[in-house]
């Protein structure tokens, strides 16, 4: 398909970099919502915003059922559970699923409800190796580790004067782009969302060719299990989320994964087969895979027994929910499969 030659991988990466640098732990997604809205208004893209703050880009004839594509822009993060004024430390609880081990030494930002931001580092409570001989034996958890806040307190001030229980915490993304590899936190799922934003320009320029409506849904509650409960009447759903790379899976960072089954059960056979055939027809690098411990935006829709076909695809991502990595070839393959489905 000629249109696929217009896809530029480096431009996708540029968009992803912008997204991963916007703090958006689930429940604190206003800034990324604003980014998506401003982009739509600048490009003349029709959009709506849900009560929860999700953003939907719409293309093509609105009265002809088509395809609903979904990715999520909420990310892993944390919430403050305790402010220790004696030790000047802040304890946190996770937003989303990850072990404490995955954020040891991580630069974090505390976002207060008064609009202030404070930089901190997640480290063991007694972190000096020269005084704590048990550090080598320690298994990190959220009791023996906490946030060390970079805030100079004046006489009479307490840490709890500035930071409160319930404040949100975002994790620094640590973005790097080296030799085709994209290293960053939050590639799950801002890599897919970045593809949506990038492809929106191509689709907008070719909107007159669309024979049915196409929607890009940017969800903001996926990491806490709140997926999509419904789609517009008659639309099917293709979820675009990270493909798993690791032991026991077939995924590759340089391919698009087409998932046959995850923890929710099998995805729609006909729609999944259609995507596989499109990948082969257009010579798109892909892997058919099964994800053993995985849920997506489509999981809620499947459990609701909706009469909707659901499929799942996405670029392979290594070290999921940690310091993740994908490759520009996998991103391009995913973008190509989406575009091939829309215009194929």
Task: List the model feature ranges, each with a label.
Residues 1-344:
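N-terminal hydrophobic/helix-forming segments and targeting peptides
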């Amino acid at each position: 398909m000629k249109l696929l030659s217009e896809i530029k991988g480096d431009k996708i990466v540029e968009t992803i970099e912008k997204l991963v640098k916007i703090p958006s732990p689930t429940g604190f997604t206003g800034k990324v919502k604003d980014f998506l809205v401003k982009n739509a208004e600048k490009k003349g893209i029709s959009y709506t915003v849900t009560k929860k703050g999700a953003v939907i880009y719409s293309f093509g004839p609105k009265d002809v059922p088509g395809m609903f594509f979904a990715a999520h822009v909420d990310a892993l993060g944390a919430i403050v559970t305790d402010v220790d004024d004696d030790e000047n430390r802040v304890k946190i609880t996770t937003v989303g699923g990850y072990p404490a081990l995955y954020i040891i030494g991580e630069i974090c930002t505390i976002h207060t409800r008064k609009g202030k931001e404070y930089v901190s580092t997640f480290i063991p409570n007694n972190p000096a190796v020269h005084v704590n001989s048990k550090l080598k034996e320690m298994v990190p958890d959220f009791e023996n580790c906490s946030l060390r806040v970079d805030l100079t307190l004046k006489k009479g001030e307490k840490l709890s004067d500035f930071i409160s229980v319930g404040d949100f915490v975002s994790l620094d993304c640590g973005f790097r782009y080296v030799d085709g590899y994209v290293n960053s936190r939050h590639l799950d799922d801002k890599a897919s969302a970045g593809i949506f934003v990038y492809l929106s320009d191509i689709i907008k320029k070719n909107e007159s060719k669309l024979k049915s409506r196409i929607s890009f849904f940017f969800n903001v509650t996926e990491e806490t299990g709140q997926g999509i409960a419904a789609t517009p009447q008659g639309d099917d759903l293709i979820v675009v989320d990270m493909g798993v790379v690791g032991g026991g899976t077939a995924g590759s960072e340089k391919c698009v994964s087409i998932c046959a089954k995850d923890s929710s059960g099998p995805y729609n056979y006909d729609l999944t087969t259609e995507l596989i055939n499109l990948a082969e027809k257009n010579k798109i690098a892909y892997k058919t895979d099964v994800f053993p411990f995985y849920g997506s935006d489509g999981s809620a829709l499947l459990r609701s027994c909706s009469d909707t076909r659901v499929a799942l695809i996405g670029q392979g991502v290594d070290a999921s929910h940690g310091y993740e990595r994908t490759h520009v070839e996998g991103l391009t393959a995913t973008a190509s499969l989406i575009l091939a489905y829309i215009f194929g």
